[in-house]
Amino acid sequence: MNNSNNLDYFTLYIIFSIAFMLITLLVILIAKPSTGLGEVLVTINLLNALVWLAINLVNRLRERLVNHRDQQ
């Protein structure tokens, strides 16, 4: 099995996670309470969690398909 795709997805997730953490830090440091950036921050963190979930589900399905194919 070629693990380069898994590494690419994991690297992409790490890059997005770091970017979301930096955006979160900037929002916390710069935002004023009345600007509504809190909702943006919550949305960004939710998207980060959904991306993580999607990547993990795709990788698990791919591993199951490869294992099933190898057993035949």
UniProtKB/Swiss-Prot annotation:
Keyword Transmembrane: yes
Compartments it resides in: Cell inner membrane
Periplasmic side: 31-34
Biological processes annotated in GO: cell division
Domain of life: Bacteria
Keywords carried by this UniProt record: Cell cycle, Cell division, Cell inner membrane, Cell membrane, Membrane, Transmembrane, Transmembrane helix
Transmembrane segments: 10-30, 35-55
GO cellular component: division septum; plasma membrane
Cytoplasmic side: 1-9, 56-72
Membrane disposition: Multi-pass membrane protein
Function: Could be involved in cell division. May participate in the stabilization of the cell divisome under specific conditions.
Subunit structure: Interacts with FtsL, FtsQ, FtsI, FtsN, and probably many other cell division proteins.
Protein name per UniProt: Inner membrane protein YmgF
Organism of this sequence: Escherichia coli (strain K12)
Name of the encoding gene: ymgF
